[in-house]
Amino acid sequence: MTRIQASGRSVLDVIRTRRSIPRMKPDPIPREVIEQLLDAAVWAPNHWMTEPWQFFVLEGEAKRCFAEMRRAVHRARLPDPDSPQAQNALEIAYRATLNTPVIIVVTSRVAEDPEVREEDFWATFGAAYAFMLGAWSMGIGTYFRSGALR
């Protein structure tokens, strides 16, 4: 996440102007700010009242482990992972992950019932989006990334 200029924004302005910020400033995000955003996120609509979302706040060693895991996943997808170009790209992505002040991983429990599972998926997305909108309203940029969704 990264700080941007923001103050007194309306909800509509925040929705219209929020953008993904792929390059993060290294400025730390205070823990109390993260907690405020998490508190807002869990108010996302959830028809079945399952509250399926889980938020993992990664800093320090956890962030380093995540960066290594992410590098391994990307490496496995490359046709020639040992080429100099691939090695350079992997290192750049690894460093960018490490330089991000905090990483919030959002997951969802997977219900057996397909209808509940679908609702939980969208409720979790809503919670993540609420987090991002709240961050933007506080002058903090975010970048949404997803892996396999189904």
Tell me what each language-model feature is:
Residues F56-L58, I104-T107:
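Short, conserved beta-strand edge motifs with alternating hydrophobic and charged residues
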Residues M1-N99:
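N-terminal amphipathic, basic helical "cap/leader" segment at the start of enzyme domains
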Residues C65, I92, I103-V106, A130:
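Generic beta-strand or strand-like secondary-structure segments
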Residues A41, I104, V110-R150:
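Small-aliphatic-rich amphipathic alpha-helix that forms the alpha element of a beta-alpha
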